[in-house]
């Protein structure tokens, strides 16, 4: 075995160890954030729960706010994620050929991801009410989701789907309909079934994608 192969294997081993350590930290932080809330959870407590040194958290992820952001990333991606969310969603979007299919894809995705991320968003929103750093994280992640939706819409429009409609307005519609708080209010608070929620998301997005713009509506003379 030559030196290059040995170095590559060592690098791969170190990367896997780093990923495993991050996963342990995120799992520990998730448990504590859910049990105690963000404000009552210290980085020291996360380190103790994860069984790692305090400095390991700062080296592997960063501040407590960064840990909370990573908790959201892990929740969104789900277990054994094949790729970051924007990457595998772009792959799924590439297989869609019409507005109905786009609405169905998003409805399937929101129904899949909402149960995982809604509890994390509750932690973020509660923390944002009293902590400036958590509030900034909330704003940043909201803006990031809106940008991701706009990129997805633009990609579909380049293929002639929902073309002629305002990209930012369609992205805003996806953002609001698929917002985790909407899931929480309908499913957790109002008792909707998961299938009813998914069907509502699909119908709502289909109506948005297929609706005519105001200047396209013809009034009878």
Where are the regions that the model predicts?
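N-terminal intrinsically disordered/low-complexity leader segments
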Residues: 1-20, 213-221
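Helix-turn-helix
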Residues: 24, 28-66, 70
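Short helix-capping/turn signature of helix-turn-helix
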Residues: 38, 126-131, 177
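Ligand-binding pocket scaffold of soluble enzyme catalytic domains
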Residues: 44-45, 56, 60, 64, ...
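Hydrophobic alpha-helical connector segments
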Residues: 64-66, 70, 80-115, 171
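Amphipathic alpha-helical packing segments from all-alpha helical-bundle domains
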Residues: 108-125, 132-159, 168-172, 199, ...
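Hydrophobic/aromatic-rich alpha-helical bundle segments in the mid-to-C-terminal region
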Residues: 156-204, 212-221
């Amino acid at each position: 075995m030559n030196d290059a192969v040995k170095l590559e294997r060592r690098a791969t081993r170190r990367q896997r160890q780093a990923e495993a350590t991050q996963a342990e930290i995120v799992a520990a932080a998730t448990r504590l954030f859910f049990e105690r809330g963000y404000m009552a959870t210290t980085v020291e407590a996360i380190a103790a729960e994860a069984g790692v040194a305090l400095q390991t958290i700062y080296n592997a992820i960063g501040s407590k706010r960064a840990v909370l952001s990573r908790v959201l990333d892990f929740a969104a991606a789900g277990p054994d994620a094949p790729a970051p969310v924007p990457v595998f969603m772009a792959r799924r979007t590439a297989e869609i050929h019409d507005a109905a299919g786009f609405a169905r894809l998003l409805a399937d995705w929101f129904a899949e991801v909402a149960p995982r991320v809604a509890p994390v968003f509750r932690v973020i929103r509660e923390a944002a009410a009293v902590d400036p750093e958590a509030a900034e994280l909330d704003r940043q992640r909201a803006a990031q989701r809106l940008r991701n939706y706009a990129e997805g819409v633009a990609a579909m429009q380049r293929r002639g789907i929902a073309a002629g409609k305002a990209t930012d307005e369609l992205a805003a519609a996806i953002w609001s309909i698929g917002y985790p708080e909407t899931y929480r209010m309908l499913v957790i608070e109002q008792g909707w079934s998961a299938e009813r929620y998914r069907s509502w998301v699909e119908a709502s997005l289909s109506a948005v994608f297929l609706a005519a713009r105001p200047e396209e509506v013809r009034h009878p003379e």
